[in-house]
Amino acid sequence: MSAKDVKFGVEARDRMLRGVDILANAVKVTLGPKGRNVVLDKSFGAPRITKDGVTVAKEIELDDKFENMGAQMVREVASKSADAAGDGTTTATVLAQAIVREGAKAVAAGMNPMDLKRGIDLAVEAVVADLVKNSKKVTSNDEIAQVGTISANGDSEIGKFLADAMKKVGNEGVITVEEAKSLETELDVVEGMQFDRGYISPYFVTNADKMRVEMDDAYILINEKKLSSLNELLPLLEAVVQTGKPLVIVAEDVEGEALATLVVNRLRGGLKVAAVKAPGFGDRRKAMLQDIAILTGGQAISEDLGIKLENVNLSMLGRAKKVMIDKENTTIVNGAGKKADIEARVAQIKAQIEETTSDYDREKLQERLAKLAGGVAVIRVGGATEVEVKERKDRVDDAMHATRAAVEEGILPGGGVALLRASEQLKGLRTKNEDQKTGVEIVRKALSAPARQIAINAGEDGSVIVGKILEKEQYAYGFDSQTGDYVNMVSKGIIDPTKVVRTAIQNAASVASLLITTEAMVAELPKKNAGGPAMPPGGGMGGMDF
């Protein structure tokens, strides 16, 4: 085990605070509509330009081990806010820096760190209660567009695209963001359920121009196993032919004699049929097939359930108004499933999302939920250069999360105003002793930091702006740094999602309290001879130091 370097008390906190300041100062220049860009060096390719706080925070690694510990803990604030609400990362970082700075001063002055922490916790509870009380539910499409615009640093086009996407796929629908191949940003909406498996054979194609299978009012056979022979299926196929309706087979695979027979029947026109492989793998495949069955009002044919193919009749097949299959995707529109069954399945998936601890599983469950509940919207972000597209895509991602958060918990006046107003509620907060009172005061001062920083980034005097906002009693009164005017923030469309503001202050206070109550820090000592011995001469490469 290598030797360690240990720092205590004031020295430890000072080194840690330096790291906090370096990271927070790099992140906070991006705050607000007049926030600046940060350029990130990449080991290959062009540098990346961004105004996304968490992206900047994730790039920062410091040489000094103790400073780096402070920086990494504040980075955690940004990451946690990004995970919980998808936005508010810069606000959370600014708040954490303000609380740590004031807290470190108080500890150096001899106050009890644990009482300070209790005071901070009391203050945060009161602030969150005030935010929730003043939160306003999102009712119109315009408000969703406004939230998106603010989060995308004032880009109204992004706000409009997001509002359209949410209108089309609903609040549960999935919105994915991709890079476009052109200059224009565009929105593409897929209604119904889509999964990433195409036709097994191009001979199933019905629309040769688009190389696509299009079937109206189709039956859907959902089978968990491979189909190699059609003997078991013959009674069912004959029944389908008599109805005159097309059939889509979803199975693990269709091969050999079974595939050849289906293709021949399709080409002769006796049976309108197409086959696709089942989506997913293992248990996820079973779950997705069950989703398709519920959506289309059919049954997933599985030996686990004791159902054999020869016993399948028409009533066990799913139905859909339209099925479209291209080389890579299958889309089922207007499945014939019962509404109550679909709602029960949606509730079940939501419960699984709440319980899962894996981000990957959560993402996959949310995709399944969207396919059942709404649909899928794809925003393709365009731009003149790769650097511009990447920067814009970052902003669209932020805005997308912010609009979801707004729909979930409502909205508050933006521009740091909601936190400023909440700070007024802390003046009369009762505490058990002076140190706890100081903890409350630390949070009260910190709550003005985001509004102050937004003004500073716009080239204004932060303290003057904060003072003028607090002079007015009106809750939504604030400073529009884009125009330099004092306005009603809500009616001007400068709004923040409640969830974003709430998670920002909670995460900032949580990590800042830990930093304030730190009394010792332990880091590895750098190795004295890190280079290692030189290689012996040989092959013309002697003396090279690895």
Swiss-Prot record:
InterPro entries with a match to the protein in the record: Chaperonin_Cpn60_CS (IPR018370), Cpn60/GroEL (IPR001844), Cpn60/GroEL/TCP-1 (IPR002423), GroEL-like_apical_dom_sf (IPR027409), GROEL-like_equatorial_sf (IPR027413), TCP-1-like_intermed_sf (IPR027410)
S-S pairs: none
Subcellular location: Cytoplasm
Chief localisation class: cytoplasm
Enzyme class, broadest EC rank: isomerase
A GO MF term: unfolded protein binding
Keywords: ATP-binding, Chaperone, Cytoplasm, Isomerase, Nucleotide-binding
GO biological-process terms attached to the record: protein refolding
Pfam families named among the record's database cross-references: Cpn60_TCP1
Signal peptide feature range: none
Source superkingdom: Bacteria
Entry keyword annotation includes Isomerase: yes
Catalytic activity: ATP + H2O + a folded polypeptide = ADP + phosphate + an unfolded polypeptide
Annotated EC: 5.6.1.7
Gene3D superfamilies: GroEL, GroEL-like equatorial domain, TCP-1-like chaperonin intermediate domain
GO cellular component entries: cytoplasm
Binding site for ATP: 30-33, 51, 87-91, 415, 496
SUPFAM superfamilies, per the entry: GroEL apical domain-like (SSF52029), GroEL equatorial domain-like (SSF48592), GroEL-intermediate domain like (SSF54849)
Keyword Cytoplasm attributed: yes
Functional description taken from the UniProt entry: Together with its co-chaperonin GroES, plays an essential role in assisting protein folding. The GroEL-GroES system forms a nano-cage that allows encapsulation of the non-native substrate proteins and provides a physical environment optimized to promote and accelerate protein folding.
Quaternary structure note: Forms a cylinder of 14 subunits composed of two heptameric rings stacked back-to-back. Interacts with the co-chaperonin GroES.
PANTHER family to which the protein is assigned, alphabetical: 60 KDA HEAT SHOCK PROTEIN, MITOCHONDRIAL
Protein family: Belongs to the chaperonin (HSP60) family.
Protein name as annotated: Chaperonin GroEL 4
Native source organism of the sequence: Bradyrhizobium sp. (strain BTAi1 / ATCC BAA-1182)
Lineage: Bacteria, Pseudomonadati, Pseudomonadota, Alphaproteobacteria, Hyphomicrobiales
